[in-house]
């Protein structure tokens, strides 16, 4: 059985959406017969987490839950990406939004074994730096997609955003088009 460690475990944020994402990541790994040895919480410096580093040494690879972290040359984002300088093991960026980053970021991202983004804007940003990526839905919707596909009747729903103005716009679109509006919480 292959094993990995997870960097940027957002379930420690105590936010419903973050909990769903990490739960879905764990479910996905299990489905692929990959053992999750350890996680490093969001905001905690993985380089100083001795327990995490011990498990990293045992693991076959590293998964980074990038979520909305890799943008605007964020110091925290850069610290996550630096894992490719620390280990020679395969590293995977998943669930990523990527925007407004400098060349120092793209140099690190280009060294990842696989990069999975959650929208085409990020894919286009990476293509500018000749970095291949695959667009997949946000991990929030992993289980929802399966449930939706198993239904006989296909319905459309609109959800909200962390941005209040965008949430209002989404709500108005739903109302105007008689579409069910489902806030994430």
Regions found by a protein language model. Name each.
Residues 1-185:
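Active-site anion-handling motifs in enzyme catalytic cores
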């Amino acid at each position: 059985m292959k094993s990995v460690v997870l960097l940027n475990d957002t379930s420690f944020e105590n936010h419903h959406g973050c909990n769903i994402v990490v739960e879905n990541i764990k479910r996905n790994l299990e489905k692929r017969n990959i053992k999750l040895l350890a996680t490093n919480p969001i905001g905690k410096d993985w380089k100083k987490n001795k327990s995490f580093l011990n498990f990293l040494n045992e693991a076959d690879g590293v998964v980074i839950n990038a979520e909305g972290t890799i943008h605007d040359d964020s110091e925290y984002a850069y610290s996550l990406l630096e894992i490719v300088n620390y280990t020679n093991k395969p590293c995977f960026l998943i669930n990523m939004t990527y925007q407004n980053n400098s060349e120092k970021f793209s140099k690190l991202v280009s060294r990842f074994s696989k990069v999975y983004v959650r929208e085409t804007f990020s894919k286009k940003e990476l293509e500018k730096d000749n970095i291949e990526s695959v667009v997949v839905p946000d991990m929030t919707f992993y289980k929802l997609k399966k449930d939706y596909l198993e239904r006989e009747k296909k319905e459309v729903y609109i959800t909200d955003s962390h941005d209040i103005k965008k949430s209002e716009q989404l709500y108005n679109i739903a109302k105007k088009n008689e579409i069910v509006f489902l806030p994430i919480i």
